[in-house]
Amino acid sequence: MTAFGVEPYGQPKYLEIAGKRMAYIDEGKGDAIVFQHGNPTSSYLWRNIMPHLEGLGRLVACDLIGMGASDKLSPSGPDRYSYGEQRDFLFALWDALDLGDHVVLVLHDWGSALGFDWANQHRDRVQGIAFMEAIVTPMTWADWPPAVRGVFQGFRSPQGEPMALEHNIFVERVLPGAILRQLSDEEMNHYRRPFVNGGEDRRPTLSWPRNLPIDGEPAEVVALVNEYRSWLEETDMPKLFINAEPGAIITGRIRDYVRSWPNQTEITVPGVHFVQEDSPEEIGAAIAQFVRRLRSAAGV
């Protein structure tokens, strides 16, 4: 039986980006292996996976702006924490961290959109991409199970503010509802900590679902996803697809589509959306094997 560690991995470090302090983990030496979380999580999501990669490179996990231990934006409001703003902060942090070449990306949720976008812009610097429950193509509402569809349609309506900013629905309901096991109070409190204060401190958890590329909106995110998708479906960049069973956002036609990507290895692990909380051992072992294979092929 898997033992689920509750302590964060590594020691938090901080860099100032555009006047805001951003938090990250940076452990070990060698070529970078970059773990990127999405909504509403933080680098804490990777705590039971990163240890599997020790000795295989420099392990980096960043907290997105307004999330984890990174600063909040001020003033805040409906126009803050868009995909573009999050990207600008994260890419500036990655630049400041000097990730070098031969980067391996490990991506989940919105971290996948950010990572796929960065990889598409830095194709010669990326050695391989591992991804799980990722944003691989624009979606339609028909792709969403009815029970979840209603909640996410709510986020994209005027009800989104009370749902997320007052009631903290994304952290209190969506997160635990997309994990097979029950998180301990200590684990939940790690995820709650950045969003303890009601109101605008919780804005990132609302801006993210409003940025999801669904039924053609928002147009700029749909265009971006189509741009990196067009590259991923033809590039021989090595890929590891960690398929979640039953999964949440890579299911049905989207799962069939992503299986068409070239030079891709696939494993299946138990999990809904936050698969790292259900299958860390399997995920960590698979990523370690993937990285060893990449390094071996490169003669490292």
Curated annotation (Swiss-Prot):
Its EC number is 3.8.1.5. GO terms for biological process: halogenated hydrocarbon catabolic process. SUPFAM superfamilies: alpha/beta-Hydrolases. The active site is at D109 (nucleophile), E133 (proton donor), H273 (proton acceptor). GO terms for molecular function: haloalkane dehalogenase activity; hydrolase activity. It comes from the Bacteria. Transmembrane segments: none annotated. Belongs to the haloalkane dehalogenase family. Type 2 subfamily. Catalyzes hydrolytic cleavage of carbon-halogen bonds in halogenated aliphatic compounds, leading to the formation of the corresponding primary alcohols, halide ions and protons. This is Haloalkane dehalogenase 3. It comes from Mycobacterium tuberculosis (strain ATCC 25618 / H37Rv).
